[in-house]
Amino acid sequence: MSYPATNIRLLITHREADESTIILAEGLAALPDFEVYMTREGIASAVVERGVTYLPSPPITGKVNLSVCRLLRRYMRQYHFTHTYSPGSSGLSNALLAILFSTVKNIAYRGTGARIRRTDPTYYLGILNPRVHHIVCETEHVAAYLRSFFSPSKLTVATKPFSLPWADEALRSPIELPELQGKSLRLVMVANNRGRPFKGLHTLLEAMLLLRDDRIGLTLVGDYDEQERLFVQSSPIAPNILFLGERPEAMRYMAAADVYVLPSWRDASPRVVREAMSLSLPTIVSDIPGSRDLILPGETGLLAPAQDPEALAKAILWMLEHPDERRAMGRLGRERIARDFSPERYTEIFADLFRSLAV
């Protein structure tokens, strides 16, 4: 759909902009009909980087921060913004207060399907505020939940992007582990598991114990609870599992694997699955919202019911017994990242949305 050319002046309010938000800001700033501004802590005056104007701001914390609201209001008068985009809840509530009695359109972001309570007044400072013109949802699952609160026309699904060049360096220099040499199937899981049983590490370890197959090796990158290591240490599968702890170049360990496994009970939209797909790794993920929205079951990976070691073991065994098919899955996964999760596509979705709201 085409919209009339309009000079869109966009302010992005966020305490700590993540990589996806910066990519979005720079992508929009490169378009001829956009001027993009973003709040940033720790600078004394406005600076321009890659087309984005960064405006000094104190930390945007709390639902109502009067100093932030006054500053945003001053920026509104100075730069004549037409839209604000708020990827975080504090940025959203303070931006909504700042645009009172103005025609500025506010766009919010929702990355989780966590319950919204109509009886909780704090939600009306943010996502339930009637001055929120549109909501960008991280996944279709999030959008489906929000349809019980909002018209579908008020919702857009835009899953955060991943750029293939980010993975290419890891592919050029994978970290091979001598302990896994000779294994027919090298699994990898990258996650911060300590104090997070919902990441499903124990389910994966139980699946490995059910298999008891010396042809299969598992590398665990990230922190973990000590009882998980002790569980493995006292089992017959101990030689097949490596607890590496936190490592700065996790993708290089992933690049040396054959299959990525994420057995979470819950997850929003795990970036690590996109990383794995960009590395041409087939994936085994839990059949839960978020993870299952990223893969194409049977094409780029397999689904297994959450908290089901037997089903997970079956999926791992399938990967072991079908090496050609799993490699084809990996290639299709990388193609899916390039096609459906590119920064260019992500920017295009937002550009079309902002233009439509300017009409």
Q: Model features per residue range: what roles?
A:
Residues 297-298, 302-309, 318-324:
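Conserved acidic donor-binding segment of nucleotide-sugar-dependent glycosyltransferases
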Residues 85-92, 110:
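Short His-centered aromatic/hydrophobic patch
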Residues 282-285, 295:
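Short hydrophobic beta-strand element within catalytic cores of glycosyltransferases
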Residues 19-26, 195-210, 274, 310:
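A conserved mid-protein helix/loop that constitutes part of the nucleotide-sugar donor-binding site
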Residues 107-137, 149:
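A conserved, positively charged/aromatic
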Residues 13, 179-199, 205-208:
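Conserved donor-binding/catalytic core segment of Leloir-type glycosyltransferases
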Residues 311, 318, 325-340, 346-352:
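A short, well-ordered alpha-helix in the C-terminal region of glycosyltransferases
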Residues 246, 265:
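Aromatic "clamp/platform" in nucleotide-sugar-dependent glycosyltransferases that forms part
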